Amino acid sequence: MHPISHQNLNKMKKRVLFIALASALVGTMMAQEVEHRKEVYVIKAGKASGINTATPVEQKEIGKAVMEFMYDYKYLTDTTDVTRNETDRMTLQVTYGMSKFTSFRTMQIDSLIRVSTAEQIRATPDSYIGGETFSIFKNYPQGRFTVIDKVSTDWFLYEEDIPVQEWTLTDDTCNILGYECKGAVCNFRGRRWTAFYTDSVPVADGPWKFGGLPGFIMQVYDEGHQYEFTCVGINSKADRAITIPEVPFNKTTRTKFYATKLRFDTDPFTYMMNVNGVNVNVVGADGQPRTDITQPRTLQYDYIERDWK
């Protein structure tokens, strides 16, 4: 990512966010018209990974799905409290020679933004909150992964070789969606993973970055269940376009991306001010400044990949 120069900052119109806080900050949104664009800023306590700008993003079609798999994605936001977790509905779009794993919720929000006005966003802000921002393209380009994600309002892209996952098959079995599944375990990116796969689906793939088993991965979770993916639906007659955003990506590496993400997740307000040129003023219900909210914080969870440091 290229740093923003003082000259560019001076030219940039400063955008000031006044965030009214309820007694318990769970999620906050403000919509405003900026140069005839709709902008929505979402700051989520716990996981600050989403500041969504409600400006429609153009998409480039790179394929057409022939099968789609829906997954429930669950992850802890506080490893000391197993009741604090978040969920998302993810979709794995599969076509000949490649696949895309992305948030179905984010796809829905993007579609909704395109037909909504700023007034509608203000009236029903919860409709525009949620959804993971990352997408993973397997074998795109050939022999590699492409990973895209957002930090604040900035788009990032990195490529990596398709990783080798050394699975050990086990005698464990289970039934998911009527499919008899077999077990396997492996160590990958700093975690011990357990997977259940079936050879009754004509696809050798899986959620997130998983693959390499003699069948389709229906469920996978790490030791401690901090991260878990479970297949909850299969569409064998899909025809939805597989797309990638046409945006100015900051091309980076996996390690550098996680370092940038950590900067934002631990101190989002400073990141927004220094990188995005956005001044953030947080006030409570009484109208008084809440500087405690803008202080840096320590994450109560680990990223899904632990080996990046």
Task: Briefly describe each language-model feature range.
Residues M1-Y41:
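Bacterial Sec-dependent N-terminal signal peptides
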Residues E33-K309:
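Extended soluble regions of mature proteins
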